[in-house]
């Protein structure tokens, strides 16, 4: 049986996150995308310390779609190197699993 998978990413702003999220949900690659605007980031980029405003994103999908979700994010994302972190939950509520798997059929 497939396992649930959370994908953490960031977007330059709320609208970009919602637009990419809607495309991923419509393609049945993810069941849901949560986007939190107003995040402040400090990060190292090409040898410099940068600051910026971003929106955090948390995607809910199944592990079997990992590579397709990653490819779709990279293709749609405006960042040169988008952050894509896979988080494997140790468990989930049965109803939550049924919902995620029902919304993201094996492809």
Predicted regions: what is each one?
Residues 1-107:
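Positively charged, small/polar-rich N-terminal and surface patches that mediate targeting and assembly
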């Amino acid at each position: 049986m497939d396992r649930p998978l959370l994908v953490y990413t960031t977007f330059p702003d709320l609208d970009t996150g919602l637009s990419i999220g809607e495309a991923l949900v419509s393609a049945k690659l993810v069941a849901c995308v949560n986007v939190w605007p107003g995040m402040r980031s400090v990060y190292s980029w090409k040898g410099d310390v940068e600051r910026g405003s971003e929106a955090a994103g948390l995607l809910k999908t199944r592990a079997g779609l990992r590579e397709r979700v990653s490819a779709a994010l990279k293709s749609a994302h405006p960042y040169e190197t988008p952050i894509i972190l896979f988080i494997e939950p140790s468990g989930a509520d049965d109803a939550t699993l049924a919902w995620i798997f029902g919304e993201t059929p094996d492809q």
